[in-house]
Amino acid sequence: MKQRILALFLALCLCLPLAACGKKQGYDPLEGVQTRVVTDSAGRQVEIPADIRRVAPSGSTAQMILMPIAYDLLAGLSSSPSTAQMPYFPEEVRDLPTFGQFYGSKANLNMESLIDARPQIIIDLGDKKDSIADDMDRIQKQTGIPTVFIEADLDDMAAAYRMLGDILNRAGMAEPLAQFIEKSVTMAQENSAKLPESQRLSVLFGTGSTGLACNAAGSVQADVIDLVGAVNAIIPEEVSNRGGGSTVSLEEVYAVQPDVILLSTGGPYDTLAQ
């Protein structure tokens, strides 16, 4: 009898943590709420809450695009703001939990932290990768949270804000941004079309701690170079849309002789500016 009681006690002890884990993983943002179906940029039909109050960005790009119209809806951040970014982050979001990002050279998604933040929807914004539909399906299956992809290259940015406005019921905030983007892009296209080839400057867009991680021709991060009528000095054999860009050597920089070198602060620019 004592052995049976002990066995039953041990079984209960083993079941308790499993039940707790199942409850945590079983968070269902669609339970007991009105829902609707949207079609995302990957062609996936996704059931989402009709009234969304908590959003998780998939990474730094999604976080940046969401911030102007939905900072107060963020359930967490893909990454904490840097010292340089801090002044541009509303105080309400600076101390939100971080759960990492899906893609890029800094991919570090913490699935448990993401679920703990209890978002009602996960939104991925950026370039349309070949695997995007499968990626979104996988994340949605693993988390149990509706996951949508919105294409947000430079050409699609206005449409991306309109789709965000629809999903988050914030069309009134999204539409002015969409119109501003359309106006700015059109102005840049018209001005660059007037530039003769002889006046188009070659540009090296360097990032990272050394400035040698370049946003090369064909990458979504470098679209703005083409938009303004410049020529990307770095033309790689294989285009990288990862956050780290395409790494080049100093010898390659010397070889292409760019007219202009663009560097971000916090890296070699600070050293050169001294």
Language-model segments: what does each one mean?
Residues A62-A117, I121-K128, A233:
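A short, structured surface patch at a secondary-structure boundary
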